[in-house]
Design a protein with these regions (language model features):
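N- or domain-start disorder-to-order transition segments that initiate the globular core
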Residues: 44-72
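Short hydrophobic beta-strand that contains or immediately precedes a catalytic carboxylate
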Residues: 75-78, 240-243
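Membrane-embedded segments
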Residues: 83-89, 111-116
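Bacterial N-terminal signal peptides
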Residues: 32-43
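A substrate-binding/cap region within the structured catalytic cores of diverse enzymes
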Residues: 115-234
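C-terminal regions of proteins
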Residues: 226-232, 247-311
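N-terminal secretory signal peptides that target proteins for export/translocation
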Residues: 1-6, 10-29
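Short internal beta-strands
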Residues: 103-109, 269-272
Length: 311
């Protein structure tokens, strides 16, 4: 190997052979370093722009992520809706997938809508009823363009807004027969239901009345059912879902419903999580939620709870 220096011509530098570390030794070393970090005896690297395995918290590489995605039947990519970095990374992952993905299902469009591949992206979104203001367009442009460049069909998968409001107001009587059957066949565990309730309460800045929580939970699950049905109906090779982190969670999101309807299918999901600059501690409760957690810096935004009130 040759090395160019500022003081002279190219010089020959000896090449050192580096052997890979034994996996068991690597795991022990990782656990010891983490223990030292938790005790404050070692500075843990900042989490932003890092990837970890959801079950173990061990570091993961982009190559490992892509390898798992390439072997999946259902690829579920989460997002924090207003974080541009999440959409950029997902676009990069989409471009790294092998050929064969024919369908990308979008939370951002109602079920039954689709993007016309013969039209420009802007025109196709307009005709499909995409709400530019609600989704902060063009935040999602990179990942939508990547999906189109793959030659995939982009299908809406979400519950219609009016249907969602009906579920919130009327409860189970607002579900159609297929929705009700799907949810009954895949009930949530007590733990998962508690996590979903906590997420809904946090998402409403702690102002969600307890009496409204059951129907809000049902509406969230009805949205998951709509997304899952669209994925299952589109299964002709690997299928991708682009949706919020809550929808792709393995404990209470779309994967629960896929497991009930396609038990032999391989589902790989990624949660994209924001961490403060310099944050070094691992968030708890990720083990059964995501296969991979991709940490990024937070988006710049005003406090969403400032002046919040329930409609």
């Amino acid at each position: 190997m040759l090395n160019q220096t500022s003081r002279g011509p190219l010089q020959t530098v000896p090449t050192l052979e580096v052997k890979p570390m034994n996996p068991r030794i690597r795991t022990r070393l990782f656990l010891r370093l983490r223990a030292l970090a938790l005790l404050g005896l070692l500075a843990w690297p900042a989490l932003a722009d890092t990837i970890v395995h959801g079950d173990s918290g061990h570091p993961a590489t982009r190559a490992e992520v892509l390898a798992d995605l390439a072997a999946a039947d259902f690829i579920l990519l989460g997002e924090t809706h207003d974080n541009p970095r999440h959409h950029q990374v997902r676009a990069e992952l989409m471009r790294g997938l092998p050929p064969g993905v024919k369908t990308v299902v979008l939370e951002h469009l109602e079920r039954g809508r689709r993007l016309d591949p013969a039209r420009s992206l802007d025109d196709a979104l307009e005709r499909a009823g995409f709400d530019r203001k609600a989704w902060g367009w063009p935040l999602h442009q990179p990942v939508f363009v990547a999906a189109r460049d793959m030659g995939a069909n982009l299908l809406g998968g979400n519950l219609g807004r009016k249907d969602g409001r009906r579920v919130v107001m009327e409860g189970e009587s607002a579900l159609d027969a297929d929705q009700a059957r799907l949810l009954q066949q895949s009930p949530l565990s007590t733990t998962a239901r508690g996590r979903l309730d906590e997420s809904l309460s946090t998402g409403h800045c702690g102002h969600l009345p307890a009496a409204r929580l059951p129907n809000m939970r049902l509406a969230q699950r009805a949205r998951d059912a709509a997304l899952a049905r669209t994925l299952l109906e589109s299964r002709d090779g690997p299928v991708v879902l682009l949706a919020g982190n809550g929808h792709v969670r393995r404990d209470y999101g779309v994967p629960v419903l896929l497991a009930g309807q396609a038990p032999g299918a391989r589902v790989v999901n990624i949660g994209f999580m924001e961490v403060a600059p310099g944050e070094r501690s691992e968030p708890a409760g990720m083990g059964d939620a995501y296969d991979f957690v991709w940490f990024t810096a937070p988006a710049q935004r005003e406090d969403p709870c400032a002046g919040f009130s329930m409609p």
